């Protein structure tokens, strides 16, 4: 195939460069036929010669129309691509266009400024483009082909080189570039130099610039052709400007170029579309001239460098624009720069306009002559004679068919309000305003107002019968005014004007001065199909709302054959349907090349209709060069297939009228008729009851008796209603259920008093019905930072902005809050804020209070009930129901203890709930029972509100947790766990802080399959949650296999013997449901029994942890029972026993607190099972079953006292504890990530870092796949290796043979499982799941902690502590799943983005931390930690850990006694609040 040898014009130059440097090239076809022809020919050549881009691929070429807001399409495409594929390489985009395409581009350019987008814009010398509209969009702006003295060949080469530079700049700095060039024709230049184009590597870097660095590194290794990952820098504007300047300077690019003598005193700074013509004229006239080559970034120092030192006066030449300005933008740039630098050069401003290149010499001469005179500084001169109008985008000639038809139909009556051609008659109005549909609508409204005033003036003249006006004139005016709005009137306006001209009176002359109002004009606003992409930004919506007599003709140009290419994000709205839904507009869908008659009828009907009219006109074409045959073919295809239906619709505007819809599409009408005939026929055939005549089925007597019964029933209802008390509507908003439960109780009490009462959530109540209510009571809780609960937010948003009259309404509000929840003074506004806001809003809307605002406070002696018990009697008094005697047996609230007692050993109605396919949820009481089965019901809180708006129930899913003592997992078990997550979960595995697995997002229908697969590999979920002994945690002790074997045996024994014995687990999850049903019918012969737990199990959960000093990787003291192994010569002799550890608390409730276990004695290994059971029995019999917040073992120990509790345990045992024995001091509570280690049995182990325990595949790492494949190979090769899950949410690969190290190392390197190159801070971190699945979460945790650590790492690196371990943990609520209370730094979630910052925990889990600052957000956290970490780095002693230092430095005081009896709340600095 032949090869292109040269470039012949600038259009070909920029299109070639853009093609070579892009993945997607948008070609905006200009209306200029010469420009468009050259561009089209260039694109054909690129296709003909099979040109490739720098990456060796053929880019996509997408044509756009210049008058249809092309940059809106481009911005949507780029931003939609980034949103959909945020972790995938993006396309590099370029644009070739002319200045008309930038007409409405400014708002879109702002969005694209940080994209590597290059737009090459052709601008003719006579084109008055307003550069001010794009100068501050953030784009780099370059000019080419404008150097003084350049020949055509040199100008073409300059354009070619600058186009290449623009792409290199965009890709290198990840910034948008506008390249303006002056078109050059009929010359020749060599093809582009490949060395000047961006490299393949530059292009790839730009494609992945938005992807996180870790993923790019992985992609780099996969690609094999990129040596190192590269991230284009992200700058704010000053930094971007500096980087651009530096890059331009490295390429020897001059932002300004000077031509003239070295001792010139007067210099012209030429800028704009005609800069090249003016520069040439200046050089010819021996006038010194400087040219702007780089407008943005503005580099004033470079300007002063090129100016001669002899310069005294600088004249800035800028193009004229249609917008009135005193000072032009470039002049102001130069002025501010010179003033800032203290320059003494005088400045002058000149505006020019060029209608032909010959005028350039005249303008330069005029400027020189003016400068030789005595001008004052800053004088503005205009040289604009003969200047062409500012460019206004106009539709191509192919769309003139509808224009011509309008002129033919309406002749002199036609007024196309936004016709660009009319700009010549509106000299004082900017052209861009004239074509704006909003301006056009305003013009019509103003015209109609003036015409109405004109008609009133005529009517007044006829009424007063002015003697100076002739009788003939009055008769003519009388005939005209009678039919002024009648389109069929026989009165000809031209004849009226002709007759009035015979009258010379002053009133008639005044009317003739406004003779245009005699004609009943038909106003038309013409728009393109671009309107259909955003109906709110066009005049369509305003026209429909204003209901004025305005006609819209909207031309749709999209061919049927290209409809699939339209992205969903840019899908057109149906304008016709939109307009018809308003019900006040005439709507027609027409196609000139399909039905000429239908179009004529639609135009006439639209003109006749007294109101807004919308006529959709179909004119499909691919490019402006398409002929009528192409349009005809596309039209026929679209109309025949039904893509473009033809119809007309006239609405009914008055009572008694009927709307008239005419379907003009023959094919659709024919098919619809066939369908309706068949449907009607089948309907008649399928009537369930024969339709017989009434005379055969009814009698008059029967009708009378029926009416008597109806009247009697209505009379009885009225009588009963008269006897009842006042109506009452109770609304509630509650996240935790408190307000809802109180509302239900209030409803029962109101009903018992005779009130006609109804109850519902606030969001379920239609706001517009408030005005019809008599009495409304609202019970509302407080969420987050004084926010409404989720089921009350829509109600509040609606009433907050509603314009209601509630003068007939009486209301009462009671709020539930906690005065100490936000202890800082500035945060007190959040206390009971929803209740206060509602009360104030009801008053604003005119409602009268039934009772004063009630504010429940959890800090009161009886909590919220203290205030409520005073508020409710006042409510009954206001309703007149206070003296009503009632005898109501209010059932006590159902507690967890009631649910357990009635559950028949954890059965409840779970079995029936699983069979209910109408919902994805289980009953509330069953959800309490499924916890004992290891299952939590959750929903996706990220989409909860959206689903509620859609009328859907929450996206329910279930979390399942396995019971896996000591976290030991075989390869076979790992494969099964992975299969479950893939088949039925959310494709991730979660390692918990209790050394087991969790699965999220399991649907109700998949619960049985999931649990059956868990059981198949000899695991269970029973007892993994609920008020029983949970999974037993145990130190991993990988260095000593002998010790771990002993500890693992103890852990398994404790786990198995504390496992509930109920058969409900097997019955519900394992057995076949049909078998269970049959057995129930036959009658249950065997009854369950729980010898250890009893029918109500424990008051709360019971946790056991086993540690082997010196490692406390399980944070043993945080468990209800802490077992610390006493080891001699690799033999576990026994255990020191600790009791009363626990993490869960409630914010600002000092009755709740974290506590560390108290060591009470020592027992031998063979007796440890007896001891654990005895402790459990004492807790079972003495724990608080009334208040679940006070039910954990730690509260039982503190309530009874440690000595009393121990006595009770010893009483159960029948013997006493021995004295606690000494053991090696604990040295740390986190995992070891220092590569492979060898055990005493010559096996190997190493830790695998899993951040926050989330095993998943993402765009950065494929951990899930890597660990799955590792497990598969270990299982296939029957390896003895196993996995151990750690309590810090990581994985230990253990028991690896030496001959397996080779392939395991390769595999781990392949999936980056061996990557432990993280800071000590990150390696020691942990987080709970929190949002979006955990129902208790108040703030983010797992998803946020890595981001926060990244920012804290910057502080750590600054202090030189990157290798030092600082234990940092985060939870989304105060329940403490990640054990934050023993971390050196902890963030405990309190509200969205808000945390309590805790400091001072023990490095190895031996000490609780304490509140340092309450209710802080990210910025405050970083500001607080920065000085502390810097001080720690400078002041610490050898081996001193951060938690120890903050206590020694007096930052906080140490928590005494392990936190017993709430010691963690003591000694908190007032500054914390």
UniProtKB/Swiss-Prot annotation:
Any GO MF annotation of the entry: sulfite reductase (NADPH) activity
Cofactor(s) it depends on: siroheme; [4Fe-4S] cluster
UniProt: [4Fe-4S] cluster binding residues: 1328, 1334, 1373, 1377
Keywords: 4Fe-4S, Cytoplasm, Heme, Iron, Iron-sulfur, Metal-binding, NADP, Oxidoreductase
Cell location: Cytoplasm
Keyword Cytoplasm: yes
Reaction(s) the record says it catalyses: hydrogen sulfide + 3 NADP(+) + 3 H2O = sulfite + 3 NADPH + 4 H(+)
UniProt record similarity statement: Belongs to the nitrite and sulfite reductase 4Fe-4S domain family.
Cited NCBIfam families: PRK13504.1 (NF010029)
Protein name, entry field: Sulfite reductase [NADPH] subunit beta
